[in-house]
Amino acid sequence: LAQIVNSGQRRVESLETPAILDAVFFNEHLDFSNVPFREREEKRADWHSRALAALDGCEIVFVDPDNGLMVPSARRSKKANKYVLPEELFDYYRQGASVVYYQHKARRQDGFYTDQHNKLLQDERIQDAEGLGLKFTRTSLRYYWFLLRPEHAETVRQCVASLLAGPWGDCFELC
C-alpha cells in the first residue's frame, strides 16, 4: 500500500491486484451520458450480463453504486446508472453469492432505508436470505446492506461482530 501511495497512483484500480486483495473485480463503468433514452435499458442489461459472468462463482458480491438502491424518480433518467436495481441484486444472489450493497444516506430518515431493505428481503426470489445492515456514522452517512445466503450468514455475522468489537466499531452501528 505504501508503494501505491508513494507512486501517486491513488486509484481504486491500483488496489485490484491479488497481492493486495484476493478478490474478483468488475469495474466497468455504466455510463448513460451519450445513450439515447430508448437504448439505456438494453445497455444496462448487457453491462449486467457481463458483470454476472465476471462474478460467477464468487461467494460474496459487493455492489457499490454511487447512490444505492434504485428510487422511482431516477429509474428513467440519465442518472439511473448511479443506482442498482433490485433485480440485479437478486441475480447475484441466485447465482450463489451473498450480496452486500452500498446505500448513500440522502435526506431521508433511517426508516426509509430499513424499509427498502426489508422489502427486498420479502421478495420470493431471495426468500431464504438473511438481512443485515451496517450504518457508517462518521462524516457522510452511509449504509452497507447484506442479503446473506444461509451458508454464509454465520461467518458474516461473526466478521461483523469482530468489526464492531475492534477499532472501527465506533464508526458503525447495526441497523
Label the predicted regions.
Residues 1-175:
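Class I S-adenosyl-L-methionine-dependent methyltransferase catalytic core
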